């Protein structure tokens, strides 16, 4: 009986630990993601990229290779999975 209780306690502890997120890593979705990103970029002194930056390249096929990260990837990295502030800042 004591062995079953010890096994149950050990399994519940393992399950609880596996569901915990590391410190500094959170999930950001929707408005919370947009506001957090806007605040972080503003505090870092980074302005939002404008379309004028892409026009200077002259070729539409170069747009995906411009500096910075793509806009679609942030949802994959920070909404579907937890991400850190450093990952968010890389999208500024």
From Swiss-Prot:
It is found in: Secreted. Residues 1-19 form the signal peptide. Residues 50-70 form a propeptide. Keywords: Cleavage on pair of basic residues, Disulfide bond, Hormone, Pyrrolidone carboxylic acid, Secreted, Signal. It comes from Bombyx mori. Disulfide bonds join 29-79, 41-92, 78-83. This is Bombyxin A-3. Silk worm has two kinds of PTTH: 4K-PTTH and 22K-PTTH; there are many forms of 4K-PTTH. It comes from the Eukaryota. Belongs to the insulin family.
